[in-house]
């Protein structure tokens, strides 16, 4: 989010950014405030890059801080992110803390559950019924989004687990989303 803020400060025009489904919605809120937009891809650097190519986006990345800037190369690069942040600090004459204070804030929780013996189709039906009032996305697992919070469930490609990510303005609201999921398992 800090790197994107730096990029927007430098470019000064509306942009389209690509990030995965599990990345903070602070990026969406920042983009909206600058007349820009965020497009979501499946989790994974290759998926972000593919979506960047499809949408002709110049900036993408994942929530781990790996920024992808087409101008540099189509791969995650933490040095690009650091440079973008430092450039913003230089251009605004503000400290990192001062810039950070201006950005949207959300509380993010990661959890996981064992999927051995779990009927994932039944779970998806139960979760869809539970979160009927949310926008549903099944691009990569299942994600439910509201204006101020979201929850994303996706089966791991490397372990017999389901990863659960939740985010909200308040920690207790993100935790409540995960608690609701665990109650129906």
What are these regions (language model features)?
Residues 1-7:
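Cysteine protease catalytic core and zymogen-processing segment of caspase-like enzymes
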Residues 10-185:
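Phosphate-binding and adjacent anionic-ligand microenvironments
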């Amino acid at each position: 989010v800090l790197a994107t803020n730096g990029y927007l400060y430098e470019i000064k025009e509306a942009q389209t950014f690509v990030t995965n489904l599990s990345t903070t919605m602070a990026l969406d809120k920042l983009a909206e405030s600058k007349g820009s937009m965020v497009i979501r891809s499946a989790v994974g650097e290759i998926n972000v890059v593919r979506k960047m190519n499809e949408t002709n986006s110049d900036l993408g990345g994942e929530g781990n801080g790996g920024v992808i800037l087409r101008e540099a190369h189509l791969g995650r690069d933490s040095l690009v992110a650091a440079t973008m942040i430092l450039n913003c600090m230089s251009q605004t004459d503000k400290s990192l803390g001062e810039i950070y204070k201006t950005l949207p804030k959300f509380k993010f929780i990661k959890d996981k559950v064992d999927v051995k013996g779990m009927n994932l189709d039944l779970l998806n039906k139960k979760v869809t019924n539970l979160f009927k009032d949310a926008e549903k996305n099944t691009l990569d697992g299942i994600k439910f989004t509201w204006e101020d919070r979201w929850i994303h469930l996706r089966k791991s490609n490397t372990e017999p687990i389901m990863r659960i990510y939740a985010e909200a303005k308040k920690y207790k609201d993100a935790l409540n989303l995960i608690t609701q999921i665990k109650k129906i398992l």
